[in-house]
Structure formats: C-alpha cells, structure tokens
C-alpha cells in the first residue's frame, strides 16, 4: 500500500525526523489559505499522486507570492500528470501540498528497503539525490552506498557514521544524519513498511538536514496491525479493478495485453503469463484466485477481467490441489452464464477431481475450449484472439 507525500511526512514528523511545515489542499482556495497560514515568503506547490518524477512532470512548482500560489494551484489541480512511473495516460491530480520553501544547498538520497536475499534491511544512500537519482543509479552506481542492517541489532552508530561520511557529510551534519537514520529505521520497523525513501534529504547552507520528500510503501500483509495507516489509503490513486478484486480477496494486477488469465497460485499464474508470451500472446492481467476459491469468487473474477475492454479472450489454468477442479468448473460455468461470455475461453485443469471438472465443462453446452497442457492452452487462446 502507498500513501501521499504529505501523509508520509506526518509519519516522519511523528518519529522525530525533521520535515518542512506544510498543509494539504484539495481546492485552489484551500491552497491559498494554506499559503497564507504558512506565511511565506516562498512556498512550494506540490501535486500529490502515488508516483515519482512529479518535478520533471511539472507537478512541483515554486511560488513567491500568494498570486503565484493561486495560479499554480489552479494549473496543477485536475491536471493529468505524466511521469515515468504513471505511464503515458498519466494520473489525475486531486490533492496538493503547500509547503514552506527550503534553503537547498546539497540534495542527498536515503532509503530503507528489505533485502530478502540477506534477510536484512538495506540502508541505501547517495550524495546525488534529487530528480535524477534513477540516472545516477544507472550511470554511476559507485555513488550509491548500501549498508545492511541486522534486525536483531538495528542500525549501529558505526554504520550510520560510515554511510553519512560516504555521502560527503561532515561536522554536525554527520551527527544529524546518525539521528535521522536511527529514527528512520525505527519508523520503518514500527510501521511494517517495505520501503521508506527520502529524496531529497536536504543539507542546507548551515549544515542542517531536512526531509524534503517522503515515499512510503507498506507491507499489505501487515496492515491488519495498522488501522491508522489503512485510514490513509486513497482509492482514487489505485486501479479500480484492483480495488474491486481486493474486496473478494483476489490477487489482481492489470497489465497491457488482451488475454485475461485466471489461475490458482502465484507461481502458476506467472508461469501461465510467461507461456502466453512465449506463444506470441500478451496477458491482460495477473489473477490468482487462491486455494480457497468458491464459485462466487470465480464469477467475480470473470466480471473484473471482462470490465477491461482490451480483453479478447480468457485462459483459465488450474492445478487442483487444495482447490478442486470441479469447484472451478462450477465457478466457470456460473460465471459464463452470469456475464454472458462473448469472448473465447480456454480451460486447462489438472489435479483433484480433474475428470469430473472436465466432464462438467464438456456437458455445460458452453463454447469452452479444453486443453491438457500449458503449451496447448496458450497456443489455443493465442490463436483464438488473432
């Protein structure tokens, strides 16, 4: 789960990480009132969307008067902001953050992310923060510093000092960095985050550090422990199909192809998409119905897939372990009738009650194309949509 910058900064502030004063705004009038309350003389008007690259996309602007704030707020609110993370369609801006301007001297980068290979938390930092951090990571990876933190000990002063000095800090800035790193790590652990990123972490002309941006990703599996974080969720920033799927406990991710996929098990789902690609097709989604799918869940899965106008065919690939093939067959038949299916459907079933499931589909009177192997299933659905 992601949240907005202004929400992330409130979390950072609650853990003692220095951030500028700022006020969220949902209208131009609220933006003007926020600027008046902050007092100026310089403000930053920031688009709030769940994507990076806002500055390059024109979603972050500096204002030097209340009139500037009013004009910029009007320009940015409602715009379709396009960045390298939104895709070509962009993301509509529905919220702004009006913030005090900052004395920017040196933009640094710092983040925490779980490293599954080492089972530790990676503290990643760079002296080259700001809008071009992706290019820095690609072109000059030697400017990226990584320190692995053992969850049993947490971040040590020695580790913090090593990173701070590696990104060019000295004097009191090092001590401030140690404090920020420790608080950031506590924030990361206490909120069950999967990513906490500050870009940039500003070092001003006096050597003081402050987080000028905040990005959070949270582990969805741990959200039951954090109702206060769940309350920050902005459904307008999420794919409507994915939001709908989550209501039925379906793992769904939209893709750009034209072949809908319904599979049980994440590994099999990924293998199914790979096989479709191998035979010249393009998957329209990732959809894992899980091991406890009911006919009702299968029906909802079909409805969600078919809301995508790009879907020209559907491939159902089921391995019957805990999930019985006859249960899926019942769901497929019910779904086909409920949605009045009018695109080709290929079904491949293997495992528990396989023969019964196949018999039910064959006797359903529906134009369902059967397949015995993944290769056969992929070949048939690719041919059917061409």
Curated annotation (Swiss-Prot):
Its EC number is 6.2.1.5. Mg(2+) binds at residues 199, 213. It is an enzyme of class 6 (ligase). It catalyses: succinate + ATP + CoA = succinyl-CoA + ADP + phosphate; GTP + succinate + CoA = succinyl-CoA + GDP + phosphate. Binds 1 Mg(2+) ion per subunit. Residues 9-244 form the ATP-grasp domain. It comes from the Bacteria. ATP binds at residues 46, 53-55, 99, 102, 107. PROSITE patterns: ATP_GRASP, SUCCINYL_COA_LIG_3. Its cofactor is Mg(2+). Pathway: Carbohydrate metabolism; tricarboxylic acid cycle; succinate from succinyl-CoA (ligase route): step 1/1. Keywords: ATP-binding, Ligase, Magnesium, Metal-binding, Nucleotide-binding, Tricarboxylic acid cycle. Substrate binds at residues 264, 321-323. GO terms for molecular function: ATP binding; magnesium ion binding; succinate-CoA ligase (ADP-forming) activity; succinate-CoA ligase (GDP-forming) activity. One of its GO terms (biological process) is succinyl-CoA metabolic process. GO terms for cellular component: cytosol; succinate-CoA ligase complex. Heterotetramer of two alpha and two beta subunits. PANTHER family: SUCCINATE--COA LIGASE [GDP-FORMING] SUBUNIT BETA, MITOCHONDRIAL, SUCCINYL-COA SYNTHETASE BETA CHAIN. Succinyl-CoA synthetase functions in the citric acid cycle (TCA), coupling the hydrolysis of succinyl-CoA to the synthesis of either ATP or GTP and thus represents the only step of substrate-level phosphorylation in the TCA. The beta subunit provides nucleotide specificity of the enzyme and binds the substrate succinate, while the binding sites for coenzyme A and phosphate are found in the alpha subunit. Belongs to the succinate/malate CoA ligase beta subunit family. This is Succinate--CoA ligase [ADP-forming] subunit beta. It comes from Paracidovorax citrulli (strain AAC00-1).
């Amino acid at each position: 789960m992601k949240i907005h910058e202004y929400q992330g900064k409130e979390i950072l502030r609650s853990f003692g990480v220095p951030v500028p004063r700022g006020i969220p705004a949902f209208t131009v009038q609220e933006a003007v009132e926020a600027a008046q309350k902050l007092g100026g003389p310089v403000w930053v008007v920031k688009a709030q969307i769940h994507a990076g690259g806002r500055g390059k996309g024109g979603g972050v602007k500096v204002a030097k008067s209340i009139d500037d704030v009013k004009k910029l707020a009007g320009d940015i609110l409602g715009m379709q902001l396009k960045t390298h993370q939104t895709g070509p369609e962009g993301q509509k801006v529905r919220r702004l953050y009006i913030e005090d301007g900052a004395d920017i001297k040196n933009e640094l980068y710092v983040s925490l992310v779980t490293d599954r290979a080492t089972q530790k938390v990676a503290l990643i930092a760079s002296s080259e923060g700001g809008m071009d951090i992706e290019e820095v990571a690609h072109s000059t990876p030697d400017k990226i510093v990584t320190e692995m933190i053992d969850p049993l000990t947490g971040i040590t002063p020695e580790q913090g000092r090593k990173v701070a000095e590696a990104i060019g800090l000295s004097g009191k800035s090092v001590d401030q960095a140690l404090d920020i790193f420790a608080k950031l790590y506590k924030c990361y652990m206490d909120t069950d985050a999967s990513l906490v990123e500050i870009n940039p972490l500003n070092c001003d002309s006096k050597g003081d550090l402050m987080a000028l941006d905040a990005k959070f990703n949270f582990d969805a599996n741990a959200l039951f422990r954090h109702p206060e974080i769940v309350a920050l969720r902005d459904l307008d920033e999420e794919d409507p199909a994915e939001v709908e799927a989550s209501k039925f406990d379906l793992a769904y991710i939209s893709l750009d192809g034209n072949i809908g996929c319904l599979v049980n098990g994440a590994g099999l789902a990924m293998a199914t998409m790979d096989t479709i690609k191998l035979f010249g097709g393009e998957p329209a989604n990732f959809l894992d119905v899980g091991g406890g799918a009911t006919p009702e869940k299968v029906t909802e899965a079909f409805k969600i897939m078919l809301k995508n106008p790009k879907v020209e065919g559907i491939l159902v690939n089921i391995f019957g372990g805990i999930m019985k093939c006859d249960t899926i067959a019942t769901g497929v038949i019910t779904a086909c009738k409920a949605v009045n299916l009018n695109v080709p459907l290929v079904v491949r079933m293997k495992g528990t009650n396989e023969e019964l499931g196949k018999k039910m589909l064959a006797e359903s009177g529906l134009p369902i194309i059967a397949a015995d192997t993944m290769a056969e299933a992929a070949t048939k659905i690719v041919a059917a949509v061409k």
